[in-house]
Amino acid sequence: MVIAFVGWLISVRKVSSATISQYLSGLRMVHLKRGMMPRNLRPDLVKTILKGHSNVDTQSKAPRLAMTFSVMKLLKNLLTSSNFCLEKKRLIWLVSCLAFHGSFRIHELLSRNELSYDSTTTLLGMDIRLVKTKISGVNEEFLIVHLKSPKEDSLKQGVNIEVFSTGTLTCPVQAWHKWLKVRKSTPDPTKPVFRQKDGKCMTGSSFNKDLKGLLGQHIDYDHHKFLSHSFRAGYASMMAAAGYPDAIIMRQGRWHSEAFKAYCKTGRGSRLKEQRDLARKLALHCDKSS
């Protein structure tokens, strides 16, 4: 029975070996909660099947590449020349700039479903705001993105991420202004902030599909691909290539809860200078290497 279930998951559902293992663990837990001792759900034959399926997954899966400034420029040009409506063009670009400079996981920004959402985890209109203030005597603008359910275990009370203007092509604050201008209204505080013109939520899946449709004109996705996580990985990779120490890279990307605590201890003025200098240095590094 277990072998038939595993075979169905592989041949019909097309799920990975890791996902099948999670399903088997969940199945075992259901039995235990109902007071039943489950039989061995991973006999030697199942283990062999899963190992073989894992090897196939590894061989067939195209490697995911880290985003770079050069590819961001290409994405911008492709969006400009695409057949998308102007609002969608600017929405995709805004999400790209935020994911890139804020090192966000894509579902920290986007909903998982087009027609439904969980208000306790999804980024709503009330969870992102533009702040104008003086920092070191200079008028500045930045976005505060409130994550209600961050991945880091010890930060379940929610965290505020500040994303500053960079003065570069990929400036997230400028992208925010341009999106609002074409949208002609502020996001509904009680609904997902990033919704398309038809009212449907932009999802991580639809965002990846749009990325592939655009970048796939120049990149063979059968051999390597850019997906939503490429933005988060890209900033870290470029920081490493530019010589930034591991501690700053970890802090910028909130790679674990201790890194975020270090982020919080850094003053706002210091974070602004650090993010802006970082963006300009990496953009310059990209121009020199291209």
Where do the model's predicted regions map?
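Extended, non-catalytic subsegments within catalytic or DNA/protein-binding/adaptor domains
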Residues: 1-290
